[in-house]
């Protein structure tokens, strides 16, 4: 009950402020809740996420406990090494302004397929409808909402209906491996069709290319025999190290960098 009372202020008093950040060259607006609301959202989503994670395919990695970029990158490398003939080509895509363009009614439809408790659904709807359109980039619940939406309308559709063997997703970035360009262009058309159903679009920078060029994904350039960090990540690290004077912050940056390597 105390959590329910706490969550009321998210909508009733507009209890958040906004801050602009820059991430991977993109400017984003974060909605930041009061500490009281953040604790409430975190507690509720800890329970919700445990139920959602059982429904995700194994090759999606964003904001999922015991997964992440390393886990997904290693799975891609393993598949490249185990089936070189079946992974000669790659199709890489990115959903256009995903959080901004997500339809709130589709997200709630997905939540209602999983949860039947009306009190919980009322809270989830408050999280989802924090903004007039889209879902909040900064809200803890949006990670689960986005993953669930794409799990229902894309991940399981590709894996279960079309039997796509080598498909990987990290948030709104996707990768498919295949034995031919023709195979991947067909899968590309299926992905576009699914995104149109939920009013989302794939960015025009999508491409099909030979794996031997290297797969620029998850902050790495991935090849069957080796992986290296993306060049601009190394440049960003060097720039930050030059700018930061605090010894403690330098140690944090170094730990973060070596965590990626």
Tell what function each PLM region has.
Residues 1-5, 10:
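Single conserved hydrophobic/aromatic residue that forms the stacking wall/gate
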Residues 14-41, 55-67, 127-148:
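Short, conserved non-catalytic motifs in the polymerase core
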Residues 14-16, 168-172, 204-205:
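Short Gly/Ser/Thr- and Asp/Glu-enriched loop/turn motifs at secondary-structure junctions
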Residues 33, 38, 42, 127-130, ...:
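Right-hand nucleic-acid polymerase module
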Residues 41, 45-103:
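Active-site-proximal segment of RNA-dependent polymerases
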Residues 103-115:
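A short alpha/beta connector and helix-capping loop motif
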């Amino acid at each position: 009950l105390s959590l329910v009372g706490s969550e009321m202020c998210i909508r009733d008093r507009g209890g958040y402020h906004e801050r602009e950040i820059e991430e991977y060259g993109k400017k984003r607006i974060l909605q930041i809740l009061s500490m009281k609301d953040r604790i409430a959202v975190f507690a509720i989503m800890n329970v919700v996420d445990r139920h959602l994670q059982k429904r995700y395919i194994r090759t999606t990695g964003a904001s999922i406990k015991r997964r992440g970029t390393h886990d997904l990158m290693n799975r891609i490398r393993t598949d490249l090494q185990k089936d070189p003939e079946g992974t000669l080509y790659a199709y890489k895509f990115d959903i256009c302004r995903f959080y901004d363009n997500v339809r709130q009614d589709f997200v709630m439809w997905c939540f209602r397929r999983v949860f039947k408790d009306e009190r919980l659904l009322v809270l989830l709807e408050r999280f989802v409808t924090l903004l007039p359109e889209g879902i909040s980039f900064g809200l803890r619940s949006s990670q689960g909402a986005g993953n669930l939406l794409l799990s229902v309308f894309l991940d399981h559709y590709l894996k279960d209906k079309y039997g796509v063997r080598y498909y990987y997703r990290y948030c709104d970035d996707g990768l498919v491996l295949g034995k031919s360009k023709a195979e991947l262009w067909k899968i590309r058309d299926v992905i576009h069709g699914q995104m149109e159903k939920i009013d989302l679009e794939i960015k025009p920078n999508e491409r099909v290319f030979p794996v031997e060029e290297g797969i620029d994904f998850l902050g790495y350039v991935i090849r069957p025999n080796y992986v290296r960090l993306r060049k601009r990540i190394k440049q960003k690290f060097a720039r930050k190290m030059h700018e930061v004077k605090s010894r403690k912050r330098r140690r944090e940056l170094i730990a973060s960098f070596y965590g990626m390597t």
